[in-house]
A protein has these predicted regions:
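P-loop NTPase switch module centered on the Walker A-proximal segment
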Residues: 1-100, 104, 144, 213-216
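Accessory interaction regions appended to the cores of large information-processing enzymes
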Residues: 162, 189-193, 197, 223-595
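Canonical P-loop GTPase G-domain recognition
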Residues: 123, 133-193
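Conserved P-loop NTPase nucleotide-binding/switch module
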Residues: 86-100, 105-149
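Residue-level signature of catalytic and energy-coupling elements of molecular machines
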Residues: 16, 22, 54, 75, ...
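Conserved short loop/turn motifs at secondary-structure junctions
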Residues: 10-11, 127-135, 172, 176-180, ...
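Switch/connector loops and helix/strand junctions flanking conserved nucleotide-binding motifs
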Residues: 35, 107-108, 133-139, 171-176, ...
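Short boundary/loop segments of OB/S1/cold-shock single-stranded nucleic-acid-binding domains
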Residues: 196-197, 209-217, 394
Length: 595
């Protein structure tokens, strides 16, 4: 295909502003979908966790044909925790579609991804989505985006961006608010008009950089990337250059191009197209493939440094090995090494002992998604409290800071301001919307924000919205940051929980276990209503006596116990506690069983 007929774009947006839905509609509009796929929602989010959480974790590629052109589209994650994915993707495209919600306007994570796009010199197209929402205010959003681009230092070309109004859910778009067409055609036409075709030379020797990896058991590793120059055919001999500039020979088996959601084998691919290749073992992200005649490496892709670390260790609780398939340190090590191949923002180092691993990532969500996928694969492990990664700069300790945006009802403002003060946050901006809600912007040290989310929901009675994104490394704030105020209820025996004893423990705090569960000594069974830890016995039965009771036993009614997701459990625990993760349970426990 002639490079002049190709357009490469990435879709970027804050989480939940409708990227993946937009891609669905573009696929349907262009007639690229199979009949069986029509009607299913968010087709791009193919992995189980993505469907459940309603977020995109992995960047994915698809391609649509429109008016004899091929548009390669990459759907990127909106969470800053998956920023490693975003940066690699932007190296493959020539422009970005910035999708912004018509009510919310640009959010912190919109800023994060847009900044990356501007650094690469990409020109944006603004799509104001969800214009059918009640309270939509597209003109205000347009002003906000303009201000954002200005703050990010956009050049004249980037500031003069085209705008299109759309409702991806209804599949309609238009160049003017008053002139919305019946379908997505205006958006596709705008992409052909505004996005420049790849600036490449097909006559030069072949060269491409791997910016994503995939694998299947049949062909092994699949490398995805954009051909920088030249042409590529199956069975071509190439030289692979890794990040350390070591060279080795390789042979390409298949060359596949994208068509809709399918990968289609092609006889030849030209510069400017995004392709998948197979046949080369041990490929890594950032590797350069080139023609043996002219060996030249492309500059390696940069990825942000991790900011949070936690220890993964072998599960050593009394219930170890009861419901997991993979329980040894060797199993955990192999799984983490396999994850490192495709998860570029992850780091794994040996821990204090041979059965512990220090795993670092971009944030709590990044690591909890990894733990959840290991748990589903049948792993058992113990995980420690997340810690922030500090650096030393010119003899001074620096720690990561986050930009926090909080949207809440005015009545909760006082308690949140007080709480953020205890966490060493600085208020940067405050915007009332005139309808009883207020938007607060803070810069806060990351260590103060660990464990804040669940507390925040309690303080705002579930009505607050909190979004955070990594901002910078700066000199560490002095003093301790506030942590959990209450102690915990710790079981002092092993056995089955009984409703008689749980009923009596309810006055002592909130319970984490229900009736009839197996527990062990040292397991945390509840949150104490005071600030000290309390050993309790949830297995105690009612003493039977031979004296007839007047009337009957009272009917014991237990209030519903609290169940934690992995993120909530990681936020809850303190330094002397662990989260035990197995395929069927998430338990909290003390590190030592003697107390």
């Amino acid at each position: 295909m002639n490079p002049k007929d190709i357009r490469n774009i990435a879709i970027i947006a804050h989480v939940d502003h409708g990227k993946t839905t937009l891609v669905d509609k573009l696929l349907q509009q262009s007639g690229t979908l199979d009949r069986k796929d029509i009607g299913s929602e968010r087709i791009m989010d193919s992995n189980d966790q993505e469907k459940e959480r309603g977020i995109t974790i992995l960047a994915k590629n698809t391609a649509i044909r429109w008016k004899d052109h091929k548009i390669n589209i990459v759907d990127t994650p909106g969470h800053a925790d998956f920023g490693g994915e975003v940066e690699r993707v932007l190296s493959m495209v020539d422009s970005v579609l910035l999708l912004v919600d018509a009510v919310d306007g640009p959010m912190p994570q919109t800023r994060f991804v847009t900044e990356k796009a501007f650094e690469q010199g990409l020109n944006p197209i603004l799509v104001i989505n969800k214009i059918d929402r009640p309270g939509a205010r597209p003109d205000w959003v347009l002003d906000q985006v303009f201000d954002l681009f200005d703050r990010l230092g956009g050049n004249d070309e980037q500031m003069d961006f085209p705008v299109i109004y759309a409702s991806a859910l209804n599949g309609v778009a238009g160049n003017e608010l008053e002139d919305i067409k019946e379908d997505m055609a205006p958006l596709l036409d705008l992409v052909l008009k505004e996005v420049s075709p790849p600036d490449v030379d097909t006559e030069k020797p072949f060269q491409m950089q791997i910016s994503a990896l995939d694998s299947n058991s049949y062909v092994g590793v699949i490398g995805v990337g954009r051909i920088t120059c030249g042409k590529l055919k199956p069975n071509d001999q190439v030289i692979v250059i890794d990040v350390k500039e070591d060279q080795r020979k390789g042979k390409i088996l298949q060359v596949m191009s994208h068509d809709g959601l399918e990968r289609v084998e092609v006889e030849e691919a030209e510069a400017g197209d995004i392709v998948c290749i197979t046949g080369i073992e041990n490929l890594y992200i950032s590797d350069t493939l080139c023609d043996p005649e002219k060996v030249e490496a492309l500059p390696p892709l940069s990825v942000d440094e991790p900011t949070v670390s936690m220890t993964f260790q072998v599960n050593d609780s009394p219930f170890a090995g009861q419901d997991g398939k993979f329980v040894t340190s060797r199993n955990i090590k192999e799984r983490l090494e396999q994850e490192l191949l495709s998860n570029v923002a992850l780091r794994v180092e040996p821990g204090e002992s041979s059965d512990k691993f220090k795993v670092s990532g971009r944030g709590e969500l990044h690591l909890s998604v990894l733990i959840e996928s290991m748990r589903r694969d049948g792993f058992e492990l113990g995980v420690s409290k997340p810690e922030v990664i500090q650096k030393e700069v010119d003899g001074e300790i620096h720690e990561p800071f986050e930009q926090i945006v909080i949207d809440l009802e005015e009545e909760h403002q006082g308690s949140i301001m007080e709480e953020m003060g205890l966490r060493k946050a600085e208020l940067k901006n405050m915007q009332p919307d005139g309808k009883g809600r207020i938007k607060l912007e803070f810069i806060a040290p990351s260590r103060g924000m660990i464990g804040f989310r669940s507390h925040f929901l309690t303080l705002t009675s579930g009505s607050g919205i909190l979004t955070s994104v990594f901002d910078h490394y700066g000199p560490a704030k002095k003093g301790e940051v506030t942590n959990r105020q209450n102690g915990v209820l710790v079981s002092m025996t092993s056995g089955k929980t009984l409703s008689y004893s749980l009923f009596n423990l309810q006055n002592r705090g909130k319970l984490f276990v229900g009736h009839g569960l197996d527990i062990y000594k040292g397991q945390i069974v509840g949150l104490h209503s005071r600030d000290n830890d309390l050993p309790v016995n949830p297995t105690k039965a009612k003493q039977l006596t031979n004296v007839r009771a007047s009337g009957t036993d009272e009917n014991l009614i237990l209030t519903h116990h609290i169940e934690h997701s992995i993120e909530q459990a990681l936020e809850f625990i303190e330094d002397d506690e662990l989260v035990e993760v197995t395929p069927s349970a998430i338990r909290l426990r003390k590190k030592s069983f003697t107390f």
